[in-house]
Amino acid sequence: MGDHHNLTGLPGTSIPPQFNYSQPGTSTGGPLYGGKPSHGLEDIPDVEEYERNLLGAGAGFNLLNVGNMANEFKPIITLDTKPPRDANKSLAFNGGLKLITPKTEVPDEHTPMMSPVNTTTKILQRSGIKMEIPPYLDPDSQDDDPEDGVNYPDPDLFDTKNTNMTEYDLDVLKLGKPAVDEARKKIEVPDASAPPNKIVEYLMYYRTLKESELIQLNAYRTKRNRLSLNLVKNNIDREFDQKACESLVKKLKDKKNDLQNLIDVVLSKGTKYTGCITIPRTLDGRLQVHGRKGFPHVVYGKLWRFNEMTKNETRHVDHCKHAFEMKSDMVCVNPYHYEIVIGTMIVGQRDHDNRDMPPPHQRYHTPGRQDPVDDMSRFIPPASIRPPPMNMHTRPQPMPQQLPSVGATFAHPLPHQAPHNPGVSHPYSIAPQTHYPLNMNPIPQMPQMPQMPPPLHQGYGMNGPSCSSENNNPFHQNHHYNDISHPNHYSYDCGPNLYGFPTPYPDFHHPFNQQPHQPPQLSQNHTSQQGSHQPGHQGQVPNDPPISRPVLQPSTVTLDVFRRYCRQTFGNRFFEGESEQSGAIIRSSNKFIEEFDSPICGVTVVRPRMTDGEVLENIMPEDAPYHDICKFILRLTSESVTFSGEGPEVSDLNEKWGTIVYYEKNLQIGEKKCSRGNFHVDGGFICSENRYSLGLEPNPIREPVAFKVRKAIVDGIRFSYKKDGSVWLQNRMKYPVFVTSGYLDEQSGGLKKDKVHKVYGCASIKTFGFNVSKQIIRDALLSKQMATMYLQGKLTPMNYIYEKKTQEELRREATRTTDSLAKYCCVRVSFCKGFGEAYPERPSIHDCPVWIELKINIAYDFMDSICQYITNCFEPLGMEDFAKLGINVSDD
């Protein structure tokens, strides 16, 4: 027994040969190489000897400072295959020694199971020197300088300012999309009756990571280890969140409903409607937790929703009954009952929040599912609760030097007029300076308004003789004198002769005057009688009937007439290079029909649409659909367009002309600037200045259908920026792409909005034209300003049209947002998968697995220039004007 059981560590036994650990994968602890193994226990390694070596008693492993911490051990750097046995030969690295942890490897049946043949140490070979890297903090993050010949991409770092991520989201990034269920099973979802520590553990798992933690995550993401997502638990912010969470759960232990609401709202991230979660209000309104004070709704908003949040930038939603600003005994701490407000932009809007205001115009916003915030008319109360319009109104004027005598007839209103209070101004007028009643306005003489026969389209024009200068006298309107004694008195320096426009209609009375008009007597005698009429003096009311409009009173004008009015009001700054001739479309073929559309208030546009079954080939008429690119079209039907393949010359300027944003459904993955004339978007892995390779964009929660689409992209598409400012798209795939843009909506004809164009492989199409898009943007913004001036009680050339419109239409036009015009500045492309009416499962492009959006800088710059011009030269709607319109814009 003693011959076969030679165990080391027992008294009187011989010491076997030492193990050599410098050659991973081999062991000399068993029988000799080539020798026949015996049936005894000679091949069992001496575990006790190995443990003594670890403690520094033997010579197998040489530990220099056993008392140091594990991450302070020095590595072993040697020139041969054996570790140094002298402590003085070890070199310092990272300020400490190295602890080698054995790892079991079984290459064959002869190798002992307990043989320590490998370690977790990283061994690098450089210039004949073998260096072992210690596993401190992060085992894969030490080699910031990659090995020779290995090109590692730069790490993907988090945006520490704008990233809202929870610990659960971090686990999803670690495990990937297939293991989402495993991440959910990591912590079981409790209910209100669960132990408090389980609830706190669950709530902390879904807390929002702070900026310091994201910075710490970025610090561990080196070039070698780009996917390191190790979260340090001993963080100061995490300790504070832990205490705040424990304090809230303790306060809600007797309110099971509120506690359950808290669990539900954290799990659903606000998608599920929940009520208020209330805690008692303190004396100073602040909450003290872990030695720090803060407002309760801010503390818990930062805990579960926002990365950064302050009290002055928050407001509560309408359905919150115990908001912090209400000063009630209970304070709601539901993080999804508060929003962050930056100017008029609201972060974190939801469907059930009815107070969302339209966001400001942004060039590089993150589009998602569009909410109906472009129309502020839904904030306007119904007509039943609005103040009635007044028949008389005053306008702020400088004090006249001499006031004429006022007759007794003007001292009291006429029977058909409403009583007038001299001290009350019109409800829609601008803030008053000095007001005078209308019956005290000076009447020095009769001004003569200039005359212009309105060159209107036949379908919208007025029939009847033009009125004489006396008929244009505004003092004869509705049996009372108007205060417009000098038409050019109110003008701006920015526009040439702002109110010196020729008027197609004489009665420029106040827009809110609702006095009925009598039909005119279209005869020469009646015209001569009106022309020979002289107004009364010394306050006498003339007995002649009031001047009225022709029988056919148009409610709209053509686009050409509206643009002429805009030139007279705003100048020619934004109309350079355009002719003033009529833009009316004259039908030259019976192969297409005309449809009437009103894109802006009071203006009618004729849109041609191809008749079903008709075909246009070779030479395209200029009034056909796609008239902007008719010279590049070979064949046109109601279902398809065939381009010739030609186009304008590509721009050779090396400047950033656009931005491409890449999405997978509603999730934005990445973006890249376009700086060359031809810019490619493909599915490869090439980094280039004129190429955006989608294969380089990671997404840990990518869906299987997105994998299939990305695999089919291959050569992708090409955007060509032309010298005339247009953008063309060429499909270089064998699968189709689906394109939509505001420019294509305008060119395709008909009244269908957001029309989807299917572009087959090797085909091209013009997706953006600057000349057409800038006209649409300019007309919409100038129409908005016209409606705003009308609501402010100012004179515009469109007053006679706006009088026929409802207040709802005018307010909708005056509150139009620039975001509603953003579709004329961008192009959206979906790869392989279609959307729209033909695809019920994907009604919007946001439902497509892989799509991109091209934002064109020149269009946004033009929109910005118009907005800045209007802001600097004209008085916008103020807070009082919005209040008079019934729109609540007051601060909470």
UniProtKB/Swiss-Prot annotation:
The keyword Nucleotidyltransferase does not apply. PROSITE patterns: MH1 (PS51075), MH2 (PS51076). It holds the Pfam family MH2. One of its GO terms (cellular component) is condensed chromosome. The keyword Zinc applies. Residues 657-880 form the MH2 domain. Residues 198-347 form the MH1 domain. GO terms for molecular function: cis-regulatory region sequence-specific DNA binding; DNA-binding transcription factor activity, RNA polymerase II-specific; I-SMAD binding; metal ion binding; RNA polymerase II cis-regulatory region sequence-specific DNA binding. Residues 1-43, 135-161, 505-552 are annotated as: Disordered. It is found in: Cytoplasm; Nucleus; Chromosome. Residues 15-26 have a biased composition (Polar residues). One of its GO terms (biological process) is SMAD protein signal transduction. Keywords: Chromosome, Cytoplasm, DNA-binding, Metal-binding, Nucleus, Transcription, Transcription regulation, Zinc. Residues 528-540 have a biased composition (Low complexity). It comes from the Eukaryota. Interacts with R-SMADs daf-8 and daf-14. Interacts with daf-14 in a daf-8 dependent manner. May interact with daf-5. Belongs to the dwarfin/SMAD family. Transcriptional regulator and common SMAD (co-SMAD), required to regulate entry into a developmentally arrested larval state known as dauer, in response to harsh environmental conditions. Probable component of transcriptional regulatory complex with SMAD protein daf-5. Acts antagonistically to SMAD signaling downstream of TGF-beta-like daf-7 signaling. Binds to the 5'-GTCTG-3' motif found in regulatory regions and may modulate the expression of genes involved in TGF-beta-like daf-7 and Notch lag-2 signaling. May regulate gene expression outside the dauer pathway. This is Smad protein daf-3. It comes from Caenorhabditis elegans. The gene is daf-3.
